[in-house]
């Protein structure tokens, strides 16, 4: 609707420029906003205020001329002027009910497919395979996945890239320990050790710190690994396979759409690193600094005003994250043919990605028109406001966090529904517990830090997963009571009551909200929308009897509105990665 109104206003502006009311250079970008007070219509624009000065007119006088020049449109019932010159648009009920019918009849709730779908590469999760996944991996994993699902729902081609940390000096230490354990304990004992990667890593680190001979062996294995030694590569692949299976188990439990096929880690770019450096050199971008190969760009300086280096090869010949990130950017542009690349990585890496994106385009690795965006996020903190840790100050493993979430949810659901059997309790607890952890994050602006609090996230009040899941079951219960499949609702939409009209107007904004999520990489916009829809349905349910309505036409209309609410909530929660329940 916003695009439709913008087109109408632009047509009116052209008319006023043609008749001399406005100067030829007076055209400005038109901004349309939704109104908060529905007595002022559904949409408003301040274009008359913006153009009053170049027109040499009072804003209200210009607004009157703009309204007179607007083409007729069936979507608009009325246009008026408010305050100093705001133009308010009232949406026609016939237009609104048409949108509702289209949404109800369509698998995509009336959201049209893009004429030119984009290929979007999304880099997210990307854990270090040397260790088990911990709470620090949660935000990238679930925020990235929500945006991926939204982009696909809108009709774009999405290529997931799980850029795992599967290379580097720490693997020498791990391979040395793996080799040692194979010799001393045999395959069965070794597999038991690898079942807990964190313990394995700590044991390897302890050996590295305490034994000079072990440390020497670890360093030698790094060199052999990086030179392509078959023995080392076999050990390395064995370790990575175990680590990746740990990651996949977490993804499956979280309901995240990443699969082994999406893994394209640091090691995938090893063969291209030397060429990246050579190509930077051939373009005259390289400089030597203390033996290292660097790129200096004028746009990036330190506090003293000196250029900051991007080091692509160390003095000892080794490569860095910057080198593999540049190789990844080139691969994603040239091989994956990305129109857009989104990186869901901690916002503390903002400078690194600014440098990478600038350099990739400067070097011609990525076309100028390709959108490169770092979707940074804040930290998940404990009650003390510091990064979330265990009681002894250690890193919280993600599997332990999810275990506790399900246990707490089980106790909560059992208390509310003691009559349920264990299997049903476990299924509900899984949906509520995992959903609560995810939604507590996804309902926050990704750029903000937030406090992790089990009591708040498992509450059935406020903007939480339990509240939203329950809201959906409440709508679904209407159709169980009516013994009606919501796919079989019929009749016309009749929006006679304010609560009906307000809910209907919000439901048809689903596509607009999803587009904002896709454009900005901000799933909290969808969370806020779903919470609002759930609240509006509650008000509608309270003020507009559905099954007890004596007028069959009104009853059918309200059932249709309930059906569209249910489908909107269900689709929305699924895009966030939640698992809606028919009963709770």
UniProtKB/Swiss-Prot annotation:
Disulfide pairings: none
Binding partners and assembly: Monomer.
Protein's UniProt name: Arginine--tRNA ligase
CDD domains: Anticodon_Ia_Arg, ArgRS_core
Single GO molecular function: ATP binding
Main localization, broad class: cytoplasm
Localisation: Cytoplasm
């Amino acid at each position: 609707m916003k695009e439709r109104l913008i087109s109408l206003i632009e047509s009116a502006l052209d008319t006023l420029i043609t008749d001399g009311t406005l100067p030829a250079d007076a055209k400005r970008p038109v901004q349309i906003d939704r109104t908060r007070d529905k007595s002022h219509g559904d949409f408003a624009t301040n274009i008359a205020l913006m153009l009053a000065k170049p027109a040499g007119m009072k804003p209200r006088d210009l607004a009157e001329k703009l309204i007179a020049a607007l083409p007729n449109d069936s979507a608009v019932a009325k246009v008026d002027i408010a305050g100093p010159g705001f133009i308010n648009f009232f949406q026609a009920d016939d237009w609104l009910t048409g949108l509702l019918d289209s949404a109800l009849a369509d698998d995509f709730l009336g959201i049209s497919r893009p004429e030119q779908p984009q290929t979007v590469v999304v880099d997210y999760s990307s854990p270090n395979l040397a260790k088990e996944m911990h709470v620090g991996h949660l935000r990238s994993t679930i925020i990235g996945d929500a945006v991926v699902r939204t982009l696909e729902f809108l009709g774009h081609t999405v290529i997931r890239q799980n850029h795992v940390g599967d290379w580097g000096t720490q693997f020498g230490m791990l391979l040395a320990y793996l080799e040692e354990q194979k010799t001393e304990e045999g395959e069965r004992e070794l597999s038991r050790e690898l079942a807990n990667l964190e313990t394995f890593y700590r044991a390897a680190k302890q050996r590295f710190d305490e034994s000079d001979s072990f440390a020497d062996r670890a360093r030698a294995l790094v060199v052999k690994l990086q030179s392509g030694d078959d023995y080392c590569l076999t050990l390395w692949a064995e370790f990575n396979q175990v680590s990746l299976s740990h990651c996949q188990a977490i993804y499956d439990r979280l309901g995240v759409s990443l699969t082994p096929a999406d893994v394209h880690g640091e090691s995938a770019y090893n063969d291209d690193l030397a060429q990246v450096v050579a190509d930077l050199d051939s373009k005259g971008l390289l400089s030597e600094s203390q033996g290292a190969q660097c790129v200096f760009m004028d746009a990036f300086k330190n506090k003293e005003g000196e250029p900051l280096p991007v080091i692509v090869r160390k003095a000892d010949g080794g490569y860095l994250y910057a080198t593999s990130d540049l190789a990844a950017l080139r691969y994603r542009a040239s091989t994956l043919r990305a129109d857009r690349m989104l990186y869901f990585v901690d916002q503390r890496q903002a400078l690194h990605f600014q440098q990478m994106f600038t350099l990739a385009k400067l070097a011609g690795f990525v076309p100028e028109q390709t959108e490169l965006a770092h979707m940074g996020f804040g930290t998940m903190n404990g009650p003390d406001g510091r990064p979330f840790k265990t009681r002894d100050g250690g890193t919280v493993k993600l599997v332990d966090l999810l275990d506790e979430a399900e246990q707490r949810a089980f106790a909560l659901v059992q208390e509310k529904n003691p009559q349920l059997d264990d299997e049903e309790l476990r299924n509900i607890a899984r949906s509520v517990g995992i959903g609560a952890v995810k939604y507590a994050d996804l309902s926050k602006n990704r750029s903000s830090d937030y406090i992790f609090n089990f009591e708040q996230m498992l509450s059935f009040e406020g903007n939480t997963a339990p509240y939203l899941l329950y809201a959906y079951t409440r709508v679904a219960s209407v159709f169980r009571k009516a013994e009606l499949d919501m796919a079989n609702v019929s009749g016309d939409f009749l929006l006679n009551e304010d609560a009906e009209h307000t809910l209907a107007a919000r439901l048809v904004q689903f596509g607009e909200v999803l587009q904002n999520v896709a454009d900005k990489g901000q799933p909290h916009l969808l969370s806020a929308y779903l919470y609002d829809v759930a609240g509006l349905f509650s008000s509608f349910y309270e003020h507009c009897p559905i099954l007890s309505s004596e007028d069959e036409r009104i009853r059918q209309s309200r059932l249709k509105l309930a059906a569209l609410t249910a489908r909107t909530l269900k689709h929305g929660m699924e895009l966030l990665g939640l698992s809606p329940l028919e009963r709770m």
